[in-house]
C-alpha cells in the first residue's frame, strides 16, 4: 500500500500557493498525518509548518497516486483550503521557495519548474468550485 499524503489547494485573491521542493518540482502544502491524526487536522498542521499560514480545510477535491520517483508511489488526497489571517507565506526547511502563483499562469511548468499533473488537476477542481465572497477581488 502506498504511503498517504494530505495536500491543500489554497486559493487567495486569484492566486494559488505552491511550494518548490528539493526535486525542483512545484508542490502543494501538506504531508503525512501523524498517528491518530485525521486528514483535516494533519493538513492544518502541515500548512502551518510548511508555509506559516493558518487555514480552514474545505471539501475533498481529488485522490490519486503520484509517482514521486520511478516505481515509488504516494497516495495524494487533496482538499480545498481557505486562508485564515495573513497571506505572507514563509518557506520551511522542507522547501526551497513558496510562491503565490496567479491562476492565469498555471500550466505544466511554472517559472521553469514542473507542476505535477495531479496537482494541476486538483487546483483546477478547486477553481471550478465557489469560493468565499471575501476571497474575490472587487
Report the location of each language-model feature:
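A generic fold-level signal
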Residues: 1-3, 11, 71-74, 93
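Conserved N-terminal beta-strand and adjoining loop/helix that marks the start
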Residues: 1-16, 32, 63
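Nucleotide phosphate-binding site architecture
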Residues: 17, 34, 107
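C-terminal lobe/hinge of AMP-binding adenylation domains
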Residues: 21-24
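Nudix hydrolase/Nudix homology domain
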Residues: 26, 93-138
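The catalytic Nudix box helix
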Residues: 28-61
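Active-site-adjacent beta-strand/loop module that shapes the phosphate/pyrophosphate-binding cleft
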Residues: 65-88, 99, 103, 122, ...
Amino acid at each position: 500500500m502506498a504511503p498517504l499524503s494530505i495536500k491543500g489547494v489554497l486559493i487567495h485573491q486569484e492566486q494559488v500557493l505552491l511550494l518548490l521542493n528539493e526535486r525542483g518540482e512545484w508542490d502543494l502544502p501538506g504531508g503525512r498525518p501523524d498517528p491518530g491524526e485525521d486528514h483535516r487536522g494533519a493538513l492544518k498542521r502541515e500548512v502551518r509548518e510548511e508555509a506559516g499560514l493558518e487555514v480552514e480545510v474545505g471539501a475533498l477535491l481529488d485522490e490519486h497516486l503520484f509517482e514521486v520517483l520511478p516505481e515509488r508511489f504516494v497516495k495524494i488526497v487533496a482538499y480545498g483550503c481557505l486562508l485564515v489571517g495573513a497571506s505572507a507565506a514563509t518557506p520551511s526547511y522542507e522547501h526551497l521557495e513558496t510562491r503565490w502563483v496567479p491562476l492565469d499562469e498555471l500550466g505544466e511548468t511554472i517559472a521553469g519548474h514542473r507542476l505535477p499533473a495531479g496537482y494541476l488537476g486538483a487546483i483546477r477542481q478547486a477553481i471550478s468550485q465557489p469560493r468565499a465572497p471575501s476571497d474575490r477581488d472587487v
